Every structure is written in structure tokens, then in C-alpha cells.
Amino acid sequence: CYQLYVGGLQGGHSGGVIHLERGNANVIMTRVYYHLSLNNIEFLLGSFKGGLKDNAIPRECVSVFASNDDFKKIKEVVLKVENDLKEELKESDEHVFVRLEKVDSLNEVISVKESQDIISMMYLMPNGFMHKSLKMDLTNISLNMGVVEMNEKFNIYFSIRSPMESAKDELSNKLSLIASMFKAKYVLDNNYPGWNYDEGSKLRKQYVDFVKETEGITLKEEGTHSGLETGIFKGALQDLDIITLGPDMFDIHTPDERLNINSFYKCYQRLIHFLERL
């Protein structure tokens, strides 16, 4: 029996940094197993656990499997994949590693066919940055294989992001089709609407003018590829004029996540004064 461990990745917010091409531990683990298959190494999955939240890029993944193949042969495949990854991710996740160790035993495993079907299904599933808005130079469509867990069932959780419902539907349809090819169940849950940039927003102009008048600061307007509650409001009330603002936050959805307290206080005071002006 053997344990595979993928680590050394940065992770991060699956919307805010998805365009940085960081490694996804679940995707990498899947790749390792698929290359074992390509080298005619049979395996029986016993456990698979990667990621904590569907909206965070997974930093780690651990999996245990049984195989009758020689340890040296398996190790050679793992090292080849690891070296390829280090080259491919040297500009975005240079510390990536894949570790193979022997373990004593496994409680339960699934069959070779079931194991290969699961890995093949995951290998086909799209992941990461898909398209960007050329007008705003902002990620427009993405998805993230955030959590994979093997208990009584084998569950895979994705977060799909786009301000356009049609684009989200297309990605959802692809995942559903791939799942059906392997007789897996696909469930769409926690869907929330996005909202597109409104060039004619009067509220945004009022806010920008207010900050310029009161603080002498010219704000830089930016879009964000992340899920916001404002999208839910906009989905229910199509005519709403919406802007978002917030404090400085760093390394969101990682152990290093932090908030600039001074910027929070400044943002809050600015919002209060702006509301008084309206």
C-alpha cells in the first residue's frame, strides 16, 4: 500500500487569483494517477482527500492506494510527473512536490475499474481560468475543483464563476456530461447570479465624484472575479444600480489571510459620509 501527498502549493481565492495559474492539488493528484494508468500500473483507491472549500484553490491533497506493482516502477512515474510540474509551474508555484511513501495497510479499497473510471472522469473535467473580458482585462469565466473527498461515496465539489449565466450553464453542462459518461451523479447547488459591469452607473459616478471632492483622491475603478452578495440582489431586482467597495485584504482563503484595519476604518467612514450625502 502506498500514500501519495501533493503539497508546496500557494492556493488562494478561486476567483481573485485563478488567473495566476497556480497549481490545484486535486488536479495534480488526478494527473499522477492517470500517468500511473498510462504506464500500465494498476491501483485500487482507498482514500482521497484534497481541499477544504470549493471556493479556495486546494493547496494539499493526500491519497492512499493499493497496488501489486513494484515500488520502484511507481516511484519513477511519480518523479517524472513531479519534475514536469516543477517546470510547468516554476513561475507560479515553484515549490510544488509530490511525495510517495509506503504505508502498512488499508481498511477498504474500491476495484481497479472503479478507481480508473473515477480518475479518468476527473482527468477530463475542466478546471481553472477559462476566459477573460478583453474590455476590463479581468477573468470572466473560471471553475475550481475545490474539494475532493472519498468516504462512503466519492464526492467532487466545483465552484463555477462568471457574471454571465449562459457561461456558467455551459461549464455546468460539460461537467454534467462528463459525469454521465461514467454513470456518476451530478448535482447543481448553491448557484448565485453574477452581475456585469454597468458603464452607465450613476451611483458609481456619484461615489467617484464624492471621494474626489472630499479627499482629493481619484479612485481607480476595478472589477473583481469573485462571488458577491450584490449579485443576489441584482438577480432579484434587475434595475438596481450597484457598486462595491471594501478594505485592503491579502492572501484571501489561505492561512496567511489578513485585513488592513486602518483601511477598514477609512472605508467605513467614507461609506457613512457618502450615504449621508445621498
Spans of model-derived segments:
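Midchain, well-structured core segments that form catalytic/ion-binding scaffolds
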Residues: 1-160
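A short, flexible beta-alpha/helix-coil linker loop
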Residues: 10-14, 193, 249-252
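His/Asp/Glu-rich mid-to-C-terminal helical/loop segments that flank catalytic regions of hydrolases
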Residues: 22-39, 69-70, 116-122, 129-132, ...
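Generic, well-ordered alpha-helical scaffold segments in large soluble proteins
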Residues: 32-35, 77, 81-84, 174, ...
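General small-molecule cofactor/ligand-binding pocket signal
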Residues: 46, 99-101, 187, 220-222, ...
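Short glycine/threonine-rich loop-to-helix capping motif typified by GTGT followed
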Residues: 54-62, 107-110, 196-209, 232-236
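Zn-dependent metallopeptidase/amidohydrolase metal-coordination segment
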Residues: 133, 140-142, 146-155, 159, ...
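Substrate-recognition/cap regions that form aromatic- and gly/pro-loop-enriched pockets
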Residues: 138-226
